[in-house]
UniProtKB/Swiss-Prot annotation:
InterPro entries: ExoRNase_PH_dom1, ExoRNase_PH_dom2, ExoRNase_PH_dom2_sf, PNPase/RNase_PH_dom_sf, Ribosomal_Su5_D2-typ_SF, RNase_PH, RNase_PH_bac-type, RNase_PH_CS. This is Ribonuclease PH. One of its GO terms (molecular function) is 3'-5'-RNA exonuclease activity. It comes from the Bacteria. Phosphate binds at residues 87, 125-127.
Length: 261
């Protein structure tokens, strides 16, 4: 199958991540995956939701939205409709769950980190790009807490990223564009850690059922893509990468690599 943009079946779209995109947020990025572009910010609050009060644990939560003209035709802001759509709620929860899976909330303490993802241009994979970009914004925000002396170490147990896979015209493809996604027999979003652990799988037989072998093949394809994405995350976070996934405070105090940003 010849893909629209000439990619191989297992080839990611070009990825560009601009760190510190917003000067006010404790962590921020602009992530570009092909023609999909998302601004992700991480903001720290010195309080937690009521269900976390008194536990000593922090919380990571997310909001997600799209610029009205992020798509080919204008879509009104959801605030004008009075409530977020079911899709928006689903994506917000997915982003929050994905990030919490690699955060030690005990080390964070009773703080909330708000992850805000705003899609400024959508060409497929907005939720997966949001997760991948938000992880970097979150890491920078957590590092600022360490630098201020508020927490002893970056409470990240590892890296997390996401990618879409699917079956289009009988072909298993990695990182679907909007047009590919629209024509997919099977559409799947996969979230994984740098250890190859699965955080979440969202898979649907849009055009019909699929087999266990299809599922296995798509997961392998997603794992291959996520490994590449996490390598990019580590390059972007080169100045603090040695502080991520560290068990002891002593090891966390080792000299970081020099920044490339």
């Amino acid at each position: 199958m010849n893909r629209i943009d000439g990619r191989e079946f297992n080839e990611l779209r070009p990825i560009k991540i601009t760190r510190n995109f917003n000067k006010f947020a404790e962590g921020s990025v602009l992530i570009e995956m092909g023609n999909t572009k998302v601004i992700c910010t991480a903001s720290i609050e010195d309080k937690v939701p009521p269900f976390q009060k008194g536990t000593g644990k922090g919380w990571i939560t997310s909001e997600y939205g799209m610029l009205p003209r992020a798509t080919e035709t204008r879509n009104p802001r959801e605030v004008t409709k009075g409530r977020p759509s079911g899709r928006t709620m689903e994506i917000q929860r997915l982003i929050g769950r994905s990030l919490r899976s690699v955060v030690d909330l005990d080390v964070l303490g009773e703080k909330t980190i708000w992850i805000d993802c705003d899609v400024i241009q959508a060409d497929g994979g907005t939720r997966t790009a949001s997760i991948t970009g938000s992880f970097i914004a979150l890491a920078d925000a957590l590092n600022k807490l360490v630098e201020k002396g508020d927490i002893p170490k970056i409470p990240l147990k590892g890296f997390v990223a996401a990618v879409s896979v699917g079956i289009v015209e009988g072909n298993e493809l990695l990182d679907l564009s909007f047009q590919e996604d629209s024509n997919a027999l099977v559409d799947m979003n996969v979230v994984m850690t740098d250890k190859g652990e699965i955080v979440e799988i969202q898979g649907t037989g849009e055009g019909g059922p699929f087999t266990k072998q299809n599922l296995t093949d798509l997961l392998s394809l997603a794992e291959y893509g996520i490994e590449q994405i996490i390598k990019i995350q580590k390059e972007v976070l080169s100045d603090i990468v040695d502080k991520i996934g560290v068990d002891s405070v002593e090891n966390n105090n080792s000299n970081p690599q020099s920044s490339q940003n």
